[in-house]
Amino acid sequence: MGKWVSVAEKRQFLKWFLTQQLKRKDAKRILEYLLQHYHLLEQVMFTEEIRGRERTLVISTLQSDEPGFAFYLYRRKIEDPIRALGELQANPADPIYLILHFHGKAQNHQYLQMLDSESREYIKRFKQFQAYKEETDSLIEAVLIENEKKMLLQQIDEALDLKDERRFKDLVKKLQELDRRSS
């Protein structure tokens, strides 16, 4: 079960969300309909995962990489907002799980406060994995550069042993470029 969030908080956030440019303009009608009907807004729970056995509404802004609209109705995916709106009108007492995709949502405290606890934990883990990924990428990059430097230094030694001045100068130039890139 989701975290309790007041209808006023949901309304305030959804009004802000509607100021964003949505990928599917007809999805805006659904959110406006929810805002106009208190009893439906009571049923809305913000989440980050599609609930296979529940009604889940997914809406994205233009700044998101996610699809613009999808409505999951008991394991069926519906991409027509008009049909989704009809389903919401026909079954007003059923819970509505809402997934919103927009730029900066991982840092939007108002949004994060409304997410159910499982979703908050999911975002927390995602942020941690992003930090691990960045750390790992920079470590791998440093190791690759260090290996390339060692290889160039060995080749420079070989060029000196063979008294190959042209190759020596080329390799020194490559080493200097590598040093500039890694600084």
UniProtKB/Swiss-Prot annotation:
Residue stretches in coiled coil: none
Pfam families the record matches: IDEAL, UPF0302
SMART domains: IDEAL
Family the UniProt entry places it in: Belongs to the UPF0302 family.
Alphabetized NCBIfam families for the sequence: PRK03057.1
Protein name: UPF0302 protein BH3876
Organism this protein belongs to: Halalkalibacterium halodurans (strain ATCC BAA-125 / DSM 18197 / FERM 7344 / JCM 9153 / C-125) (Bacillus halodurans)
Lineage: Bacteria, Bacillati, Bacillota, Bacilli, Bacillales
